[in-house]
Curated annotation (Swiss-Prot):
Keywords: Ribonucleoprotein, Ribosomal protein, RNA-binding, rRNA-binding
Family matches, as SUPFAM superfamilies: Alpha-L RNA-binding motif (SSF55174)
One Pfam short name: Ribosomal_S4
Protein name in the entry: Small ribosomal subunit protein uS4
GO cellular component: small ribosomal subunit
Listed CDD domains: S4
Encoding gene per record: rpsD
Gene Ontology terms for molecular function: rRNA binding; structural constituent of ribosome
Organism of provenance: Clostridium botulinum (strain Eklund 17B / Type B)
GO biological process terms held by the UniProt record: ribosomal small subunit biogenesis; translation
Length: 206
């Protein structure tokens, strides 16, 4: 599966805000954005007025980077969102939230979506009792996500039990059983990503 392999901190600097792509490090003074909050490159520190297209493009890039998705896959999600009932932009964010790697992150198993993606790829999770190692797997309401029995002795998952995360309303966790459950579809209020999805819709509608 294709993925971005460059410097993660450059992505935050390019978008002009913390995207929290490196988990706990983003909350420390080691965060590159704290030291250099301007865009990377020779002219990164200079201020330039952006066109409407540029603003829309940056919003789309920001969303892609938050969820760790390449352009082709992101457009596929958008096209699917267009054909769903409801508001296209909100549908897009809901589809992204219901990816297995994002649900694993929301449940608190990974400090970042990137870490959650690695945990899924390495086969640490079951969905409804069956192993799933595909990050883009779309979870549905009432799906149960469980840590594999053999993975539970890992310090990573022990931390989950000892320090459970506050969950969004659409998820529940049974910490003692190393499992989480999707109890509803996320509403727009439940999705705390700093993205204006209307700008993304405007971009793709051109």
């Amino acid at each position: 599966m294709a993925r971005y392999t460059g410097a993660t901190c450059r992505l935050c600097r390019r978008e002009g805000m913390k995207l929290f792509l490196k988990g706990d490090r983003c909350f420390t003074d080691k965060c590159a954005f704290v030291r250099r909050s301007y865009a990377p490159g020779q002219h990164g520190a200079s201020k330039k007025k952006m066109s409407n297209y540029g603003i829309q493009l940056r919003e789309k890039q920001k969303a892609r980077r938050i969820y760790g998705i390449l352009e082709g896959q992101f457009r596929t999600y958008y096209e699917k969102a267009e054909h769903m009932k409801g508001i296209t932009g909100e549908n897009l964010l809901k589809l992204l939230e219901m990816r297995l790697d994002n649900v694993v992150y929301r449940l608190g198993y990974g400090a970042s979506r990137n870490e959650a993606r690695q945990l899924v790829t390495h086969g640490h999770f079951l969905v409804n009792g069956k192993k799933v190692d595909i990050c883009s797997y779309h979870v549905s309401m009432n799906d149960v996500i469980t840590v594999c029995e053999k993975s539970r002795s890992s310090e990573k998952f022990k931390t989950f039990v000892e320090n459970p995360k506050t969950l969004p309303k659409w998820l529940e966790a049974n910490v003692d059983n190393y499992e989480g459950k999707v109890v509803a579809e996320p509403s727009r209020e439940d999705i705390d990503v700093p993205v204006n999805e209307t700008l993304i819709v405007e971009l793709y509608s051109k």
